[in-house]
Structures are given as C-alpha cells and as structure tokens.
Amino acid sequence: MKGIHLKKAHITDVRKIHNLINLYAQKNLLLPRSLSEIYDHLRDFWICKEKETDELVGTCALGICWEDLAEVRSLAVLERYQRKGIGAGLVKRCIEEAEELGIKRIFTLTYIPDYFERFGFRRISKSMLPHKVWADCIKCSKFPDCDEIAMILKL
C-alpha cells in the first residue's frame, strides 16, 4: 500500500465516504448509506487515502451489533486502486479493532466470499445471524430475496 494512508475516518471525510459507498450501491454491490447514517456511525469507519492527492480511495466499517458480535460492512475501494492490498488493509484493521474491543465474532454479508475466506471467514447460513442484523436489509433493492453470502470469523 505504498503511497496510501490507512486511518480512522474524520468528519471531513463523510461526503467522500458517502460518494464511494453509493458508487457501488448504484451497481447493487453494496447497501446505500445516507449522509445521516455515515455521520451517525462515523466512528465505525476506516479509510484509505492517497498520500499525494488526499483522495479517498477506500473505506470499510466495523459495526458493533452486540457484546460478542460485529459486522464488517461497506467495504469499497475505487476500481483503479483494487488489487493493491487496500481492501485487505481495511478488513485487517477492522479485525484488529474487533479483537481490541474484545468482540468474539465478526460477520459479513458479501458477494465475494472467496475474498473474505482469505481472512479466515467461513460461510454460514443467514439464519444463524440475529434478526437485528436484518434491519438494514429493508433498504436493499433485492429485499427480501437476498443473494449475499453470510460469513463469520471467530476470534
């Protein structure tokens, strides 16, 4: 990740995070996020910026669901920056943060299960996840016919 800076998101990053996530939401690859949601959950977000241009090139969030459960969500990397380790850096940092917080399990809903298997996530039935996690699904254009794959990582 040469020339890339990974850090916690700042209030000035919200609109850029919003634009990046919704770029992929328009392609039905991520759930859309409103500005209000991103402001409400700003502390969940990690970002990667290009050092020279300060361009936001990637983001990912660790959403806390319960005392022992968190979600890796809203992973997005600009296409021209993919396959450079940026997404991996973001996911690893979310995993590290979960460990620091004492969280025992992290899940994700994804279209790229092979990618998350690299970090130790394994496929599970969606029915194994608590009902609380499905609140966001109402915003999905594919609801109620979810085609994402549920995965979990035990820490």
What are these regions (language model features)?
Residues G3-I17:
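A short beta-loop-alpha structural element at the N-terminal edge
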Residues K8, N19-P32:
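Helix-loop element at the rim of GNAT/NAT acetyltransferase active sites that forms part
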Residues P32-F45, G58-L69, S74-L75:
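A conserved beta-strand-loop-helix scaffold within acyl/acetyltransferase catalytic domains
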Residues E52-G58:
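Glycine-rich acetyl-CoA-binding "A-motif" of GNAT/NAT acetyltransferases
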Residues L75-Q82, Y111-I112:
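A short, internal acetyl-CoA/4′-phosphopantetheine-binding micro-motif in the GNAT/acyltransferase core
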Residues R83-E96, T108:
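Conserved acetyl-CoA-binding loop-helix of GNAT-fold acetyltransferases
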Residues K104, T110-D136:
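Conserved active-site alpha-helix within GNAT-family acetyltransferase domains
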Residues L129-L155:
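C-terminal "cap" of GNAT-fold acetyltransferases
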